């Protein structure tokens, strides 16, 4: 079968930094497909390869990577792409076309309209399979997401639509389900009888000024909270699915999201130097902190504290699950530290379980000790990157790592109050935790796990 990935946004950051390396690695694993990259930055394939692909890339990859100058605003663009695809398809009797939209959401509508025109003009005397891949954020808000989905479903069936949140391709997300449901020692304590609180921390050291034109329209809510954070919460709190099939997992995730009320108590800020060279005042939030509850039977009353944003002192992504201290102090009234599970996503994937053990040469004095799993130490450095797993699933037609439209819709509903344009946005100095994040901890009598 002839399989072609038509890469919209083929000269953008996502394609250059994530998708092309993923394509190369999959080709090295003997997955067979062609890539047609579309872009406006270069006029020829030679210029594209010289400026976009590492010179050390093997010919086993570059021989299967083509390029077409493509301006979506050009009325002749569709004809050019149709002609190119006809040339690539040739006389093949089985063809799969994968349209990968690495574009801003505002361009989805035009892209889908053009894809429909291309499909109609192909005249392929063959068995044709179609897929379309759309990146997060899917839409700008609930209304636009629903509108884009209506447009998508006029051209593709739900089976053919792959909505990407690359965090679902990360090993830690899949490990989270395995850890919870394949280990009785964890499974039996993972509910509101024993868990006191959960923290989710996503701090980044870099800013957004180099891609301000894009980020100014997106902000921290659309960039991280509506997608990555909501998906993590579903994996942390979903009930055990009947199986690990995409349908059964999605059913339990949707139940979690439906139980969460819209976030009405939150704080947002922007770092002080944001847009300083842009010539205008930029009020786009780059940091947010809030509390929410999952109102299901097993997780009701467990507060989930979230903070996420840019220009922090240290880059870290982690989940901190704190357990209730129900231990009676029988050991000479020594203070007992709460048990915890700490899942670190960045800078490296580790899972720590914190327990209290006796210190040597003491009279029953205890000390918290961590038992650690380290992904790279245990399984080596061959763990696939998230996008490699995502693309592989697309190629084989497995939708287990892709959020459903119901999940996306519920996630937009939850964060919708945070998208209002009249928000108070506090300015915070770079490399410092915003005051409102510290205040959230103070008001709720907890300490951020730093």
What do the PLM-derived regions correspond to, one by one?
Residues 1-134, 138-450:
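Secretory/organelle targeting and membrane-embedding segments
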